[in-house]
């Protein structure tokens, strides 16, 4: 009888352990992650526990612009937010690969886009107290607008709908606007050393970011050689960009790609030189005071994510 009495508590502890971020926070959906997602779906009806306290899951942002070239931002925006929030100790952020694995098990494919109305279900499966997602749109060439929505998973209550817009070259600033608004809405404690990390953008180079996002998507689709090429291109554009170096190293460690000397040298150089040269300048300092009336309403936008110009053929000289 004693075991029956404490069985619900034991189940809660097990589920919390399984849904907590692991020590290997990579970008590859492994066999173990897929098995976790399958088990969560199998046990969905028996999940009676409340969401894990201070746990935050960020879904992919849906591209509503009608421009396929902007699709890399769907995972890219979530990727940057997850990476930033993972440095804040007062909140537990669900790994991106767990969302990806769960979405695939739900039959949503490698895109990982959650169907409207199913967010609370996904939040429960991820054992997340809070859930955020959003849409990407725009009205003019190169003008970007990102509208997000922050939910309390258990009640589906909307906590806030922060938004930001700007030129495509300001993507790093747009992400930071949403980041600090989430922190404010959830009243998260951020220590000074954490704030210093949060103020550092993933990259200010739009080409580097585009390649990074495409690399992550290629990896999700199982095209690891293409992912490697995108990561290397990203690092070539900006050696200090976030995630790309670790993602490239992960592909090598898991023996998913053919390792060439160039790749080994690139990863080695990144290990030996850590730079903070991407720190925001005073002119780019982010505003951290927000007011409810300042939050823009949702609009539809058309934006084209710039592709790198094609290289002209080299003329042979006699």
What residue ranges belong to the model's regions?
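Bacterial N-terminal signal peptides that target proteins for export
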Residues: 1-10
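Bacterial N-terminal signal peptides
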Residues: 9-18
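C-terminal/domain-edge helix-coil "capping" segments
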Residues: 25-54, 141, 154, 158-318
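Short beta-strand->alpha-helix linker/helix-N-cap micro-motif
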Residues: 30-33, 45-119, 131-140, 159-160, ...
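Sec/Tat-exported extracytoplasmic proteins
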Residues: 62-65, 81-85, 89, 126, ...
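Surface-exposed short loop/turn segments
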Residues: 112-149, 154, 251, 258
């Amino acid at each position: 009888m004693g075991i029956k009495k404490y069985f619900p508590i034991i189940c809660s502890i097990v589920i919390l352990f399984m849904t907590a971020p692991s020590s290997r926070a990579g970008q590859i959906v492994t066999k173990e992650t897929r098995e976790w997602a399958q088990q969560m779906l199998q046990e969905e009806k028996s999940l009676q526990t409340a969401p894990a306290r201070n746990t935050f899951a960020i879904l992919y942002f849906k591209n509503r612009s009608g421009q396929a070239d902007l699709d890399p931002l769907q995972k890219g925006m979530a990727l940057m937010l997850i990476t930033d929030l993972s440095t804040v100790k007062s909140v537990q952020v669900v790994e991106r690969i767990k969302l990806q694995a769960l979405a695939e098990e739900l039959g949503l494919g490698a895109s990982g886009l959650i169907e409207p109305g199913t967010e609370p279900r996904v939040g429960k499966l991820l054992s997340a107290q809070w859930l955020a997602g959003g849409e990407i749109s725009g009205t003019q060439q190169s003008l970007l607008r990102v509208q997000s929505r922050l939910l309390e998973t258990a009640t589906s209550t909307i906590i806030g709908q922060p938004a930001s817009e700007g030129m495509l070259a300001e993507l790093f600033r747009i992400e930071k606007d949403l980041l600090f608004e989430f922190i404010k809405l959830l009243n998260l404690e951020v220590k000074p050393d954490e704030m210093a990390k949060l103020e550092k953008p993933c990259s200010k180079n739009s080409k580097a970011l585009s390649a990074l996002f495409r690399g992550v998507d290629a990896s999700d689709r199982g095209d690891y050689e293409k992912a490697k090429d995108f990561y290397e291109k990203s690092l070539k554009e900006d050696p200090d960009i976030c995630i790309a170096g670790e993602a490239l190293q992960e592909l090598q460690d898991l023996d998913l790609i053919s390792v060439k000397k160039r790749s080994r040298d690139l990863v080695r150089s990144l290990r030996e030189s850590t730079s903070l040269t991407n720190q925001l300048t005073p002119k780019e300092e982010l505003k951290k005071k927000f007011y409810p009336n300042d939050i823009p309403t949702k609009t539809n936008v058309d934006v084209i994510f710039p592709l790198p110009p094609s290289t002209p053929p080299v003329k042979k000289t006699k």
